[in-house]
Amino acid sequence: MEGIIVINKPKGITSFDVIRKLKKFLKTKKIGHTGTLDPLAIGVMLVCVGKATKLASDLEAKDKVYIADFDIGYATDTYDIEGKKIAENIIEVSKENLEQSLKKFIGNIKQVPPMYSAIKIDGNKLYHLARKGIEVERPERDITIEYINLLDFKDNKAKIETKVSKGCYIRSLIYDIGQDLGTYATMTALQRKQVGEYSLENSYSLEQIEEMTLNNNFKFLKTIEEIFSYDKYNLQTEKEFILYKNGNTVKIKENLENKKYRIYFQDEFIGLANIENNNLLKGYKYY
């Protein structure tokens, strides 16, 4: 069994809980997700099954769309509503002030990840240190925010929709917005609406997956071809195939656009590659 599942994660369980349940339903151990959702968060979670786990990093790199709610005026240690309140500064914020602040975060920016995260520093996961009351300096990360739309705002409670790159923490974005406003802000709800081209409309609940597997219905498993929208390229000869599989650069006869491609040999999918200089094929994921 192999492929990719678009899960609609419910609130109150971890991403690992989702994987554990799927292993039980599908009776397979080779399953992995492509981006953690906190227990508070709901929404789209891409899960790789079987050989598809080799391609997880490419899926993780896709842009994501979130809808987030937050309160302005206080901070917690986790930057979300489930943490301990550590600071408060109630000020009146107008819709115009908030909209001006949001504009400052659009584009290529630097972001410091939260202490309560799975990022490792010197071999230690940050959330393990945070639970011991230890705070360490975290290096800034380069992220991109394509847009932030203010959906609702009343009485210092806001709802936004935003499209972000890999590595962006919405909790940190909201905290930073609060800082820019001269106060604090804390995330109260989060929904991942979309990962790449896959949205809630394409997703399945865990209950649906369980019922479908009991009926031997596996249509929820998407193929690699369905998930990756990269153009297809067929290697022409056995020599090209061997060079590719051994990790060597393949010089092809055609002039192609410099971008990522799905690579096939004898109509069988064998991995992903970048085209450079229009005719140099360099594999980076092998299936």
UniProtKB/Swiss-Prot annotation:
CDD domains attached to this UniProt entry: PseudoU_synth_EcTruB
| Molecular function terms from GO | pseudouridine synthase activity; RNA binding; tRNA pseudouridine(55) synthase activity
Q: Which cysteines are joined by disulfide bonds?
A: none
Q: Which InterPro entries match?
A: PsdUridine_synth_cat_dom_sf, PsdUridine_synth_N, tRNA_psdUridine_synth_TruB, TruB_C
**EC numbers for this chain:** 5.4.99.25
Catalytic residue list: D38 (nucleophile)
Tell me yes or no: is tRNA processing among this UniProt entry's keywords.
yes
Q: Which EC class is the enzyme in?
A: isomerase
Q: Which UniProt keywords apply?
A: Isomerase, tRNA processing
Listed HAMAP family: TruB_bact (MF_01080)
Q: What is this protein called?
A: tRNA pseudouridine synthase B
